[in-house]
């Protein structure tokens, strides 16, 4: 049968001839000079039915069967060789020529080591708090990686190994997060992280409220006692256009550094961070109290609770006459330290001698060196007055330390003046003016100069002399203040012992600040946009919430460890992935001892208690009270 006896074959020959003519025409026309300076483009549509007329370019192979056949042949040959080698290795192993380790090594194409540590525990906690779901709900994106996923990675990094944004991708690639999230480490580059910070910034208040409320409800946190304090985080750089990074005063921070301030409320139950607000570094501590009181009152009213069910504990920088009236206006109870600044306050602080305090111990142990006596203080501002219950506390250890330090400084000053007197008559110390100048320099450099009276004079024989003595009256007046401080409250039902014990617990919020600056490394700040600084501060606050919440839950299970100690205990855990030549993979954990197994079981029990608590639409059941300190009710959320 003639293979060209079909219409398709005839058409194929016709197509070949057509293309030959086109090619010949192109060669002919290329040697002829164009007769017009411009040519108009020819517009048209070429239609070709491949199924009916055949291929438009018949010299191209429609099916690359040769390449496919070669590929299949090579795969078959490789599999055949591998099977032969496997059989040969098996025979050698059975004969004892090869060890099992050599066989396993031959069957292993590669091995990968992923850092795991405390990642499963912390990731499960964040999933229990629904951090990823809440952020994705408010910050939608069409990207393959949601903003909630990126935020969770940032939070985990702050908890385990705080790094700059540009190093996050490398860190993810070394951990088991790649397998857990099913995403490549390159997805978490610094540009994507910055976009996430920009995306969550408009929703920071809403996101924090919902995440924080998840923790309060699922862990049943007691909100009857709230601690409030302010801290500062140092920033590096110029920040010329920043509204937050400013110069200002803050304790234990250098005055020549720009800083960002944070006002934080923390629960006495577990020291969990609650409501917070970041402010300019130039903001004074007392200026933050008014807005904080408004935020607290608004939140409590929104949840249907009376403000007087909670008591706010603050340090002495958080109280003056105006603030005392604001507490009264909002109906909030408070217990705060007070710096004696008025004549009435100083008179109350020094009213009793040390001997008169010894009959009024306020510590839990009667032998403890803490004493207190009560009184009243009236605060007046803008024509309004409020009277508060006051407690003068004498801390014996603090008093003894202050007096011991003062005596050491007096002894050092006495030695300096004696050394100066021994050099009188030497060059530059031959006139009363020069000697007095040297005395003044030493007094100015000493912190106890107010207790020493020094005199330079000429003797009857015409010799220079220097004498000094301790001002016993000034020293006795100063010792009257040693180890003493004032506490004031508008809760008249609390005893002196309850006031003292509750105020000593206020270091809970200071522990939050310590964790933020040491473990989470919030400071120093390197971001230069206020929006990203605020968003990164939110990431750190969620990390702090997870840190303190996990610590509270495991300690309630009887595991007396901090979260940092737990992370260090789990640090050696790793995931080993073995890849075989046939494409199969084997995942296994590094060996776990019995003690670590027991720890993980307690941690799992702690997380299970929260996992099964469902947060309803109303979030908080009303009327949930139990006894707390004294007669004050305990509020459970």
Model-derived regions, located:
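N-terminal regions of proteins, emphasizing targeting and processing segments when present
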Residues: 17-25, 31-33, 603, 607, ...
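Anion-binding and metal-coordination hotspots
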Residues: 90-94, 102-121, 129-637
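Conserved glycine(s) in the ABC-transporter nucleotide-binding domain "signature"
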Residues: 5, 29-30, 35-148
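Leucine-biased recognition of intrinsically disordered, low-complexity hydrophobic segments
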Residues: 11-17, 23-24, 624, 629, ...
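Intrinsic disorder/low-structure terminal segments
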Residues: 8-9, 19, 56, 72, ...
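Low-acidity, Ser/Thr- and Arg-rich intrinsically disordered low-complexity segments
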Residues: 2-12, 16-19, 25-31, 37-38
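Intrinsically disordered, low-complexity regions enriched in Ser/Pro/Gly/Gln/His and often acidic
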Residues: 9-12, 46, 58-61, 69, ...
């Amino acid at each position: 049968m003639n293979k060209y006896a079909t219409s398709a074959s005839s058409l194929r020959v016709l197509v070949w001839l057509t293309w030959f003519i086109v090619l010949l025409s192109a060669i002919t026309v290329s040697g002829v000079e164009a007769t017009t300076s411009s040519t108009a483009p020819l517009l048209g549509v070429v239609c070709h039915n491949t199924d009916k007329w055949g291929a438009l370019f018949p010299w191209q192979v429609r099916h690359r069967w040769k390449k496919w056949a070669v590929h299949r042949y090579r795969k078959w040959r490789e599999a055949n060789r591998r099977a032969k080698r496997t059989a040969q290795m098996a025979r050698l192993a059975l004969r004892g020529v090869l060890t099992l380790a050599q066989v396993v090594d031959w069957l292993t194409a590669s091995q990968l080591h992923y850092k795991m540590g405390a990642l499963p525990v912390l990731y499960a906690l964040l999933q229990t708090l629904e951090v990823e779901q809440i952020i994705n709900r408010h910050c939608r994106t069409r990207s393959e990686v949601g903003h909630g996923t990126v935020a969770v990675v940032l939070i985990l990094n702050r908890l385990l190994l705080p790094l700059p944004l540009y190093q996050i991708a490398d860190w993810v690639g070394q951990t088991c997060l790649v397998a857990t999230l099913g995403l490549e480490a390159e997805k978490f580059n610094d540009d994507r992280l910055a976009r996430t910070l920009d995306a969550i910034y408009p929703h920071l208040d809403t996101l924090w409220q919902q995440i924080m409320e998840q923790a309060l409800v699922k862990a049943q946190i007691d909100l009857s006692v709230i601690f409030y304090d302010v801290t500062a985080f140092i920033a590096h750089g110029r920040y010329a256009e920043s509204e937050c990074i400013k110069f200002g005063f803050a304790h234990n921070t250098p005055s020549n550094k720009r800083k960002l301030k944070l006002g934080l409320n923390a629960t006495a139950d577990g020291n969990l961070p609650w409501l917070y607000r970041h402010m300019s570094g130039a903001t004074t501590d007392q200026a933050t109290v008014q807005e904080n009181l408004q935020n607290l009152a608004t939140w409590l009213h929104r949840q249907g609770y009376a403000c007087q069910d909670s008591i706010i504990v603050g340090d002495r920088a958080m109280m003056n006459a105006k603030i005392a009236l604001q507490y009264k206006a909002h109906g909030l109870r408070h217990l705060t330290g007070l710096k004696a600044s008025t004549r009435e306050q100083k008179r109350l602080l020094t009213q009793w001698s040390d001997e008169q305090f010894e009959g009024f111990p306020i510590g839990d142990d009667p032998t403890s060196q803490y004493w207190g006596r009560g009184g009243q203080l009236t605060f007046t501002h803008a024509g309004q007055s409020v009277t508060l219950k006051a407690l003068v506390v004498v801390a014996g250890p603090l008093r003894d330390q202050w007096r011991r330090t003062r005596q050491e400084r007096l002894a050092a000053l006495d030695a300096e003046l004696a050394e100066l007197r021994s050099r009188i008559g030497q060059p530059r110390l031959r006139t009363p003016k020069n000697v007095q100048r040297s005395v003044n320099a030493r007094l100015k450099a000493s912190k106890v100069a107010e207790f020493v009276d020094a005199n330079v004079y000429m003797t009857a024989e015409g010799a220079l002399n220097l004498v000094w003595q301790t001002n016993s009256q000034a020293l006795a007046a100063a010792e009257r203040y040693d180890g003493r401080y004032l506490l004031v409250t508008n809760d008249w039902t609390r005893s002196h012992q309850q006031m003292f014990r509750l105020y000593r617990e206020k270091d809970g919020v200071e522990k939050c600040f310590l964790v933020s600056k040491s473990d989470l490394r919030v400071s120093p700040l390197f971001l230069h946009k206020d929006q990203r600084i605020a968003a990164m501060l939110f990431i750190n606050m969620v990390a702090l919430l997870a840190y303190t919440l996990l610590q509270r839950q495991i300690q309630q299970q009887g595991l007396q460890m901090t979260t940092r100690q737990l992370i260090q205990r789990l640090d050696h855990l790793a995931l080993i992935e073995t890849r075989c030549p046939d494409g199969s993979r084997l995942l296994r954990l590094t060996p776990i001892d019995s003690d670590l197994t027991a720890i993980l079981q307690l941690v799992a029990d702690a997380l299970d208690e929260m996992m099964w608590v469902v947060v309803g639409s109303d979030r908080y059941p009303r009327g949930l009270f139990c006894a707390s300190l004294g007669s004050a009710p305990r509020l459970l959320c």
